[in-house]
Structures are given as C-alpha cells and as structure tokens.
Amino acid sequence: MQEGLKLAERYNASLGSSQTYPIDNHHDKESSTDVATDDIMEKDLHSGKTISSQNSLDGSEASTPVHQLERPTIDVSERNDSRRKFRKKTSLDDLLDQASKFQPQYEYSFPTSFLRKRKAPQSNESDGEEEAKQNRTNKIVKQKKTKKNVKVTSKSKASVPIEEKHTINKQPKKTGTGGMKRGPKPGRKKKSQKNTKNSIKKESTNAINNHKMYEMDSASSRFAEHKNSTNSESANNSFIDWSLPKFSPPYQIFDIDNINSYSNFQGQIYSSASLTKHHNEIGSKTPFSRNRDGSKSPIDDGQGKLIGLRSILYPDYYEEYLMDYKKVNFRYDGMAEIGKIMEYVGRIYLPEKYQKEYKETVVDIYNTAYDNKDLALSISTVEKYNQFVGSIPKAEIVNHLAATKELPRSFLHDFLQIVYTRSIHPYASKLKQYKAFSNYVYGELLPGFLTDVYSKCGLSKNHLFMDLGSGVGNCVIQASLEFGCRESFGCEIMEAASELTEIQMREYSNRCKLFGFKQSKIDYSLRKSFINNEKVESLIPECDVLLVNNFLFDGKLNYEVTKLLQKTKVGCKIISLKNIRASGYTLDTVNIESVLNRLEVKKYRLDNNSVSWTHNGGEYFISTVLDRIDESLLDPQKRDRRNTHRPAKYTR
C-alpha cells in the first residue's frame, strides 16, 4: 500500500507543477484511487513486478501477478495528450527540436539568397504610434547634431538620422539603354491581394511588372555605375554620370600603331539602323509598332530618317542610325546611344582645346533636342557633329589617346553593350533552347559584377583567365578588354551559345578597330565539354583566375570540376556562385590529397542586378589554392561552425 502511494507521488512530482493527480490517504474518493492505481500499474508493467489488486489497496494482502490483472479501460493516449498540453517546454526539448531539423549538405546544399527571402509584412502604423516609438527612442539615445547627421522626414513624420555618405541620390535624367540591358527579366505578375498592409511592397512589384512586355530589357540594371548621381547638372544634361571615379587600365588600351597604320576603316559591322528595324519587326505580331504616346502606327510608314554618324578615328566611315522620336523600343534606343557616343568622344577622344566648344555646340544642343523630342534639331546636331569631328586632324587625336591614362569604366561597359546588342539581340531566341534546371541552363554575369570580382582577384595583363561554361563569351571578352589579360579562354558545350560566341567575336574585333582598342589574345573551345578536354587540361596548370558559374551544376559535374582543380597551381583564384568545397566537407584519410583541403574560401555579398536570371542579390565565393592545408579544416571551432551552418529559408 505505502509503496504504491510513494510511486504515485513520485510520478506526480515528475509531471511538475502544471498538473498533479491527488492522492487521498483515507481513500474517500474512488476517482483518485483509480488514477493512482492505474499509474502504479503503468509503471510496474515495465518492471515485471507483481502489485496489489484494487482490494489490496483497501487493506487486503492478496497479491496477483501483473499479467493476470484486468487493466481498466482508460485511454492512455488521451491522458498523455492532456498532460503534454499543460507541460512546459524545457531547454532539452528545444535542443531536440533543433537537432531534428533537416540540414542539407554537400552538393545538395543550395546557395544562400538568389531567391526572395521570406519577410514579415510591413504594417503601416499610425502617426501616433510612430511618434510614441520615436519619443521612446530619443529618451534612450540622444543624437548629437553634426554636419554628418541629417534628418529625413518620412510620410509618417518619423525623422531618422542618416549619415550623409549613405544618402541616395537621384539617377541621371537620361538613362536610355543605348542597347538592351542584360539585366534580369521582370518577374511574373503577382495576384492582387486584399490586404492593404502590403501596399508598399505592391507598388514596387507593380513597377516591375509594368515592364514585363519588354522581354529582356532593364535599363538601369545593366551597369551599376549609372545609378547614383551626385551632380545635379549631370543628372539633367547628360546621358552619363561623370561624377563616378575613373580607373587606370593596367595596359595601353588604345592600339596606336594600328590606328596610324590605316586611314580607312577595315572591317564590317552590324549597324544601329539594322538593329532598330529588327526590333521594330519583331516588336508586334501585327504590322504595327508602339509609339511613345502609347498609340500604334504602321512600321513602314516612312517616318523617321536614316542618318550616318561619323567615326572619330576614320572620317570616311559612317554608321547608320534610324532617328524617330515617335516610335520607341525599350529593348534598344539608338538615339540615346548617339548621345552617349557624342559625350564619350568629347571627353576621351578630343584634345582638351576642342572640348569646351564641342560641348556647347554639339553635346548640349543634342541633349536639349532629345529632352524635347525635337527630331529636326537632333538631325541637324548630328550633322554638326559630323562636321566638327571631321575638321580635327587625326594626328592630334592619336597623340591625345596615347597620353590618356584614365578612363571611365562606363565607357568600356557601354562599348561591350554596343557589341552585345548587335551580335546577340537578333538571335536571342536561340538561347532559350535548353532543358530547365539542368547543367545546360543559360545565364549571364553582368559587367558591373565582373569588374568588381576581377578586381578582387587582382586580374592583370600578365594573367591567364579561363571561363568554364562561357556562354556567349561575355566574361572572356570583358577580362581581355578591361584588364588586358595575356590570354582569355572560354569553353562552351551548347550549340546555340557557341554560334553566338562566334558572331559576337567578329563584331567585337571589328568594333575594337573602329574605336581604336588594342585586342589581347582570346581563344575558345566551342561545342565541347570542359570534361576530358585536352585544351582545357593543358591550360589549367597555368591558369591564374578561373571562373566557374556552378549555380546549377549537379553533384556529378561538381565532382568533375574538382578533378580539374586538382591540377591548378598555387595562387590560382577560383570564382564560383556556389562554394566549391561543400559546407559539410571534412578532412580525413580518404581525401587527404584532394585540392579541396588546400582551398582558402572567402564569401562575398553579391549585389542586386549582378546576374541576368534574377534581380535579387546573393553570395559568391573566391577560393585561393594554397600550398598547405587550409587552417579552417584543422580548427575544431571553425569546423563545428561550418558543419552546423544552416542555409537561410527561401520562398518562391
């Protein structure tokens, strides 16, 4: 009897203070006796002991084996559920829950970001609530008023101190594409929601969806350099943000000898007028094109005028442009491209003594005509431009270029854009012929991101650059033009991308002659995989910077990439969108000779508008091949942190 009561008391104590079952020493209540008896039976069933029957609790000494007892018909699951309901969650339970969560590892892990992260909806609080919050904040921390602290008043009258260096400036007024921007495609149009709390998010979504009709256009995402203007005059009267810092090319970017060798342009290019006509023809399934005012008009209605834009280095050559302010094509704006070329010519090619007059009589007038959509004034200004550049002796221009030490990066990026629009736009539909979510999915890294990552790798004119999966060749061409690599090499297996690589290389070579750029060695291995490729295997040991866009590589292909990296030299930089060495990788006797043990991996933040397949940012990695084992693999603390890292959650 006493032993049973003690067991019942012990069981109640284990349940905690949230719920206990009463034990009546006088046995006045049958309910408490039943519960206590059942608890005792439940414990002793597992121990194999014999316990007293119901009569034993009343004083009888008769005992019965456990297997001969008749268990009361009590639903144990319901009783346990009720106990769990009131039971407090302990720290041990939290640890068990965390340990039970799924953790992806190795090649099945997904790279952080690139997909929209789930965020709590932003609620529009009342003015009174925000003011109350602000008052509480001001009581805790009092901001000192200095020159660096300025206050910006929001719509809700809540003032927030912001440092001057973080102030967002307006974008230059004329952001005409001058060609299709290889930015991300606008996302799908979201369904309307009744919840008004997400109004801020809806406005930004609608702003993106309004441009969905222009399939591959993103005027502001092609070059990050054009975004934050701090010069009010530049914002109103220029196609280019001249306030951005210039850079010094690591080599003599202008080919002075080649410019002096030819008086006439030796080459054939795809003209702007041909590109404009192409976009007008495919812009609609009907024989109509959309005008700037939203109306439609026949494509061949005779409006607009063909006009030639004179080359600054070869006065005998004119590139044809179709000028028409009535029709607008958001994939390519030839008239904005004219404005950019005029400004670059004045700042880069013309000697300083001509620049002031040129700006006043050509650049400023064309900008005014573009703003007012004055076709007649635009045409007359182009004619004035042709006369002006034709009157300057070529020798003075060449001497000025030879002494040039700095250039705006936007000049090189816009030049690459001109090449891209002429060679890729007419055949862009071919790039859609691939299997989704496979190793053959096509995607591009944009020039702004490439400039940043190449600079981090220290790419220079003495380096060999390689791109495994080079697509249409953009990364290879930019490494050659902007950094002057001694050799830039790309490998591409897809037929369509390989064909467009050849077209782009022809256009690039001819455009370099027209603009006077020096061409470094560029080579490709097209329509072939980089696996078991003799040319790739011969160049890998000499490679200084290697680019692998492994965002959608499967485990098998990643394994083949690792085998190739085994031959890389010490100091080689490897750029990737997913970590070459998986988060769960550990050093053991089996993989002791693997190159993955000698990789020093650094993760960087990928800004928005860095890749073609999404507007969102993410992360990328630069791995350096060491001559020793990476210390992070030997440090237990770092190893534990690496193995327990959980990627962020994602939404569609």
Curated annotation (Swiss-Prot):
The keyword Lyase is annotated on this UniProt entry:
no
Activity regulation, in the record's words, is: Ubiquitination of histone H2B to form H2BK123ub1 is required for efficient DOT1 methyltransferase activity on histone H3.
Q: Its catalytic activity? A: L-lysyl(79)-[histone H3] + 3 S-adenosyl-L-methionine = N(6),N(6),N(6)-trimethyl-L-lysyl(79)-[histone H3] + 3 S-adenosyl-L-homocysteine + 3 H(+)
* Biased composition, class Basic residues, residue ranges: 139-150, 182-194
User: Where does this protein reside within or beyond the cell?
Assistant: Nucleus
UniProt-listed Enzyme Commission number(s): 2.1.1.360
Q: Does this UniProt record's set of keywords contain Cytoplasm?
A: no
Domain (DOT1): residue spans on this chain = 321-638
Q: Which InterPro entries match?
A: Dot1 (IPR021162), DOT1_dom (IPR025789), H3-K79_meTrfase (IPR030445), SAM-dependent_MTases_sf (IPR029063)
Keywords of the record, alphabetical order, are: Chromatin regulator, Methyltransferase, Nucleus, Repeat, S-adenosyl-L-methionine, Transcription, Transcription regulation, Transferase
Q: Which GO terms describe its biological process?
A: global genome nucleotide-excision repair; meiotic recombination checkpoint signaling; methylation; mitotic G1 DNA damage checkpoint signaling; mitotic intra-S DNA damage checkpoint signaling; negative regulation of heterochromatin formation; nucleosome assembly; postreplication repair
What positions does the entry give for S-adenosyl-L-methionine binding? 442-445, 465-474, 492, 529-530
- List the molecular function annotations (GO) for this entry: histone binding; histone H3K79 trimethyltransferase activity
GO CC annotations on file: chromosome, telomeric region; nucleosome; nucleus
Task: Recite the other comments.
Answer: In contrast to other lysine histone methyltransferases, it does not contain a SET domain, suggesting the existence of another mechanism for methylation of lysine residues of histones.
Stated role = Histone methyltransferase that specifically trimethylates histone H3 to form H3K79me3. This methylation is required for telomere silencing and for the pachytene checkpoint during the meiotic cell cycle by allowing the recruitment of RAD9 to double strand breaks. Nucleosomes are preferred as substrate compared to free histone.
The text of the family note is: Belongs to the class I-like SAM-binding methyltransferase superfamily. DOT1 family.
State the name under which the record lists this protein: Histone-lysine N-methyltransferase, H3 lysine-79 specific
Query: What is the organism of origin for this protein?
Result: Candida glabrata (strain ATCC 2001 / BCRC 20586 / JCM 3761 / NBRC 0622 / NRRL Y-65 / CBS 138)
